[in-house]
Design a protein with these regions (language model features):
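Conserved acetyl-CoA-binding loop of GNAT-fold acetyltransferases
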Residues: 30-37, 87-89
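Conserved short beta-strand elements that form part of the metal-binding/catalytic scaffold
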Residues: 35-67, 113-118
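Vicinal oxygen chelate
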Residues: 20-22, 69-113, 120
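N-terminal beta-strand motif that seeds the catalytic metal site of vicinal oxygen chelate
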Residues: 1-26, 53, 67-69, 117-136
Length: 136
């Protein structure tokens, strides 16, 4: 894949719609610790989340959105507390999962749902009934 400095280097780039991209970028930066990669005028902002990325675009927020953004983090408990202190609605508190992750779910100020996951152990899929067919 060729790289273009104007486009995030990620293979999958979720785009989240917010009525005010600047306010959204500021909020997710403060609440979830993401950083701005590139600001395009006042209507589109590319964000970095560790080695992942997503884009915030201007538009009308659709009700009953059918997406969830999963972000790999370190320290789920601390991250959850930071999100809560900055106004995130915590849907599920951090919990250990049988597949080796500690996860929590949050909703941001526009109703976007986020799943934050911290690896706590390397568990083979067959140990938790993951049914893996191809792992690299």
């Amino acid at each position: 894949m060729r790289l273009n400095r104007s486009v995030p280097p990620c293979t999958v780039i979720p785009v989240l719609i917010y009525p005010d991209p600047g306010a959204a970028a500021d909020w997710v930066s403060k609440a979830f610790g993401f950083t701005i990669r590139l600001r395009i005028a006042n209507h589109r902002i590319q964000m970095k989340a560790g080695d992942g990325c997503f884009t915030i675009a201007e538009g009308t927020v659709a009700p009953n959105s059918s997406h969830l953004i999963q972000v790999r983090i370190e320290n789920a408990d601390g991250h959850c507390e930071r999100a809560r202190q900055n106004g995130a609605i915590i849907l599920t508190e951090p919990q250990d999962q049988p597949y080796g992750e500690r996860q929590y779910n949050a909703e941001d100020f526009c109703g976007h749902r986020w799943d934050f996951t911290e690896t706590i152990a390397d568990i083979a899929p067959e140990e938790w009934s993951g049914g893996a067919f191809h792992l690299e």
